[in-house]
């Protein structure tokens, strides 16, 4: 099952979804007063998909469509993104709170555990979820982010990784962050139809 699931996730890069927005159900979970939006489709074992930067739930549309005949696919909008609440203050984005948001979504669906899938920044949240809450982690799939120890090691000792990760440090500078507009970030999306959803 794990190999099949991973293969489907990796291979579902073509646009299968069509108008997935008419097929998914939208809902909110309450994470200690912060509303976390999620979209869900299908039935079966629960998969929770956590997007990276600068995406939102819609980035998982193809995977949701491909897996929905065998799984309940749930893609969240992390706090600060799209339809989820955007609390002010950096302290409201601590990874422990982001993990708590995933817990809130799982609990709002009446479940005790899930297959956790994360990409990029969502991969960091997925790793922390699995490390902190193994009893709630049925399986873990992380795309584009190594184990936290490996990442820490590479950031400390590998000049190539330091260079490749510099963009994240740049985002912390006020003058750079102020230039990150929805229109500019949407240019990263290659599919013109999908690009419109990011603005």
What are these regions, as identified by a protein language model?
Residues 4, 39, 62-69, 104-108, ...:
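Residue-level signal for well-ordered alpha-helical scaffold segments within enzymatic catalytic domains
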Residues 2-46, 69-71, 112:
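Alpha/beta-hydrolase fold catalytic core
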Residues 18-23, 46, 74, 81-117, ...:
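Flexible "cap/lid" subdomain of the alpha/beta-hydrolase fold that forms the substrate-access gate
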Residues 1, 12, 38, 52, ...:
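Generic low-polarity alpha-helical segments
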Residues 34, 40-85:
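Conserved HGGG/HGGXW glycine-rich cap/lid loop of the alpha/beta-hydrolase fold
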């Amino acid at each position: 099952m794990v190999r099949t699931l991973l293969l489907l996730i990796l291979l579902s890069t073509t646009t299968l979804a069509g108008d997935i927005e008419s097929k998914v159900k939208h809902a909110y979970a309450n994470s200690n007063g912060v509303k976390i939006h999620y979209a869900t489709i299908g039935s079966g074992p629960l998969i929770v998909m956590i997007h990276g930067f600068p995406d939102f739930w819609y980035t998982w549309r193809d995977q949701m469509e491909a897996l929905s005949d065998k799984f309940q696919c749930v893609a969240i909008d992390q706090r600060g993104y799209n339809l989820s609440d955007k609390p002010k203050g950096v302290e409201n984005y601590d990874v422990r709170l982001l993990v708590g948001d995933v817990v809130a979504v799982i609990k709002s669906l009446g479940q005790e555990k899930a297959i956790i899938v994360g990409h990029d920044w969502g991969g960091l949240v997925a790793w922390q979820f699995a490390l902190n809450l193994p009893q709630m982690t049925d399986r873990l799939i992380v795309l584009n982010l190594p184990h936290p120890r490996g990442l820490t090691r590479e950031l400390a000792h590998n000049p190539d990784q330091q260079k490749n990760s510099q963009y994240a440090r740049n985002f912390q500078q006020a003058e750079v962050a102020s230039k990150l507009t929805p229109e500019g970030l949407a240019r990263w999306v290659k599919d013109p139809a999908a690009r419109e959803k990011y603005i």
